[in-house]
Amino acid sequence: MYLDEHLTWKHHINFVCKQIAKSVGILSRTRFYLSCKTKLMLYYTLIYPYITYCNSTWSSTYVSNLNRIYSLQKRAVRAVTNSEYRAHTAPLFTKLKILDIFQINTLDIAKFMFCYHNNLLPPLFLNLFMTNSQVHKYDTRTAGNYRVHPCRTNIKKFTILYQGPKVWNCLPACITNLSSFPTFKNKVLEFLLK
């Protein structure tokens, strides 16, 4: 991972984009020679590791940086499915059951929040968040939701203190009430791929 002198992830994202672009080129050149299943295996071998490696750390950046990776992901999905250059990719992601960069980030945050909610994290992390019922005693429908930390800057919005409660509060209760981590992960995947 690359971190520059201004503590931004721009150099790392440039590196990831460069590696993904090479792999997209390989997928594009082989698009008419390999089956969809084989190209999907190539995607998960050549591209997916660059997107997921320490994603929860470096993906907390500006959307403009992540959009570069997302556009390369869209090119890769078009190559896997032999779609036209301007084909709409949302149905292709769903058909192939591939998560885009934003959904991968959401999944990572949801997994962290599940561990927090079920006290599976080290003691250092146990007092990061408060539920609304801990802040006030009113019986509201959002009493069980985590309180979102107020932010004055965009940099704070990139932190887990802000993103964690936002993601957790958006999940349906049938998912957040689960106690098994593998089941939770599968249900969140289904929720994101809808």
Where are these regions (language model features)?
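Hydrophobic/basic alpha-helical segments
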Residues: 1-194
